[in-house]
Amino acid sequence: MVKRGKKTKYLFVTGGVVSSLGKGLSAASIGALLENRGLEVQHLKLDPYINVDPGTMSPFQHGEVFVTDDGAETDLDLGHYERFTSAKMTRRNNYTTGRIYQNVIQRERRGEYLGKTVQVIPHITDEIKAVIREAAGGADILIVEVGGTVGDIESLPFLEAIRQMKYDVGEENAVYAHLTLVPFIAAAGELKTKPTQHSVKELREIGIQPDLLLCRSDRELPRDMKDKIALFCNVDPSAVFTALDVPSIYEVPLSLHREGLDDKLAELFNIWSRAPRLERWETIVDKVKNPRRGEVRIGIVGKYVELHESYKSLNEALVHGGIANDARVKLAFIDSTKLEEGDLSDLDKVDAILVPGGFGIRGTEGKILGVKYAREHKVPFFGICLGLQMAVIEMARNVLGLAGANSLEFDEATPHPVVTLMEGQKGVTDKGGTMRLGAYPCTLKEGTKARALYGAELVHERHRHRFEFNNDYRAQFEAAGMVFSGVNPDLGLVEMIELPGQHFVGCQFHPEFRSKPFAPHPLFAGFVKAALEHRDAQQRQPPAEVKKLAVGKNG
């Protein structure tokens, strides 16, 4: 480990040509490589949109909202950072234009700029530089990812701030990495460098000369192509790297290491570090690519299935569950709104059913049908957040006989509000940042599946919700066989449920936010194990006829 007391060094990651090139994964992979060389790494994501945070944004526009232990609703890239490194993300690891401006305006209202005209330069850029320094937290290297694409007007204050940082901290303490696209044009049969040249030209016009280029491509760039890019972009030929498309995201660190990226960074930073130890990554990639126990199909019943990024951490946590069981997890995204039309045949094609979190009434009856199918057909089931609430409503209607049972979120006139608004949420009118957010304790009941999977009595998990199970109905559910296996020790809130005799588990929290490839979350490892056992049992039996469950008011 580098000795403390040395200045933090800053790596700024920008992107050009098109969005969704993989800046977040690249930043996370670089973090993994540097951490494996014995360096302490931290991350910061700067997002150019004016929202204070992504908490109120549609998953179709933004993808998943990643929740940190301290209750921040953040960009999904922070999930990559946590999964790839040991760094803990907090609210200081993600800033938006809206949050930066909010800070500056609050200072202006308090009179801290008294007598001055508050401007983008220097006040906004100074605030950006201040949050960059704060995010470093004494780490050896802070990796700063600037969201958006170079050339976007929204990104200009952030780019100006990171331009100034090199002069503030010194050339050896700041490196600019630019991720760009080198497309292969099939009709011409060749790679094209012009988009990269124009992107770097745009960056240089802003005042930033990239120190290294990550060239995203579906094939290796030949040496002469790298030399051409280096010549036209004014970088050293040894600083042009192929960012190769790979089958698994966990192969990205290994791919970049083979390119020599971490060695080049050590040279540019003039920093000594040990050789990277990547055996763990090699093992993980081998398990992902060559599973010994074959493939298992998990059905995700949700309404955001058209954009898989909406469930990014969930998808990766299921992959981790597969790693723990030496199996490949095949995800089948099932649109809950289509289940409401009556055809449940897609559910018969999977080895387990998962109902994830979500908001709003659309698609909820389809999710309830998915729960009913799992319960009646003994298919392994896992309900997360809203998924737990759907399981409660399904059992209330179809086992307890509580006609019209529902959540107050969807029906304020329901005769049986088995899911109700949390006491602390009553009277709350603002939407942003007002839910039950962050890590809370959960006590697990002795003798339950949850306790066995965790191997502990007390756990802490991250939450993002306003509604909870209504404890007024608890005795009725227990009499019908439901086990309340996890409870918040402070407020008595139900955190976990399960049904005996099958793998039927629900949790009010989001365990996917704590899962890593090297430490799969026990609930996902247990769920995938149950799916494998169900798959094997089904293969020993003749296929059952698909049953269509009637769709009615009670699900």
From Swiss-Prot:
Keywords: ATP-binding, Glutamine amidotransferase, Ligase, Magnesium, Metal-binding, Nucleotide-binding, Pyrimidine biosynthesis. The active site is at 385 (nucleophile), 510, 512. Pathway: Pyrimidine metabolism; CTP biosynthesis via de novo pathway; CTP from UDP: step 2/2. The keyword Cell membrane does not apply. L-glutamine binds at residues 358, 386-389, 409, 466. It comes from the Bacteria. GO terms for molecular function: ATP binding; CTP synthase activity; glutaminase activity; identical protein binding; metal ion binding. Allosterically activated by GTP, when glutamine is the substrate; GTP has no effect on the reaction when ammonia is the substrate. The allosteric effector GTP functions by stabilizing the protein conformation that binds the tetrahedral intermediate(s) formed during glutamine hydrolysis. Inhibited by the product CTP, via allosteric rather than competitive inhibition. ATP binds at residues 20-25, 77. CTPSs have evolved a hybrid strategy for distinguishing between UTP and CTP. The overlapping regions of the product feedback inhibitory and substrate sites recognize a common feature in both compounds, the triphosphate moiety. To differentiate isosteric substrate and product pyrimidine rings, an additional pocket far from the expected kinase/ligase catalytic site, specifically recognizes the cytosine and ribose portions of the product inhibitor. Catalyzes the ATP-dependent amination of UTP to CTP with either L-glutamine or ammonia as the source of nitrogen. Regulates intracellular CTP levels through interactions with the four ribonucleotide triphosphates. Homotetramer. Belongs to the CTP synthase family. HAMAP family: PyrG. This is CTP synthase. It comes from Anaeromyxobacter sp. (strain K).
